[in-house]
């Protein structure tokens, strides 16, 4: 079966950000077609939740593709339309099991031109561990 898939090219106009592609539930064929459509519009391809099998297929197609295995993300091209902001975002993960999601968030922010800093495994069960990062995260004004 070949279901229609559509990329939201108007998202940048509405939100200032290009759409990320959720790779987990898409076939290799769908990811290939979506990537080709996005590249044809001179936009960056950002695929999240992609496994190594799908990523390796796209890496073979696109020499300038980069796979970030720990984040389960693949990027093809460069974002030439980054946000112009001096804001900084802190990304805080409670445990090491959150690493992939933390790295995905960091990649997304970096692609869009947002300065960020990740704090990995700060602990949520022990308040003393989280509080020890307060002096680093408060100046950011944005915490994920």
Regions found by a protein language model. Give the residues of each.
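Long amphipathic alpha-helical segments
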Residues: 1-68
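Arg/Lys-rich RNA-binding interfaces used to dock onto structured RNA substrates
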Residues: 11-14, 58-90, 94
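Short, ordered loop/turn segments at secondary-structure junctions
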Residues: 25, 50-52, 72, 95-96, ...
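N-terminal loops that bind phosphate or other acidic moieties
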Residues: 37-40, 52-54, 74-86, 97, ...
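Short, well-ordered secondary-structure micro-motifs
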Residues: 58-59, 102-103, 128-131
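Glycine-rich phosphate/diphosphate-binding loop of Rossmann-like nucleotide-binding domains
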Residues: 90-126
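Conserved small/polar residues in nucleotide/adenosyl-binding loops
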Residues: 134-140
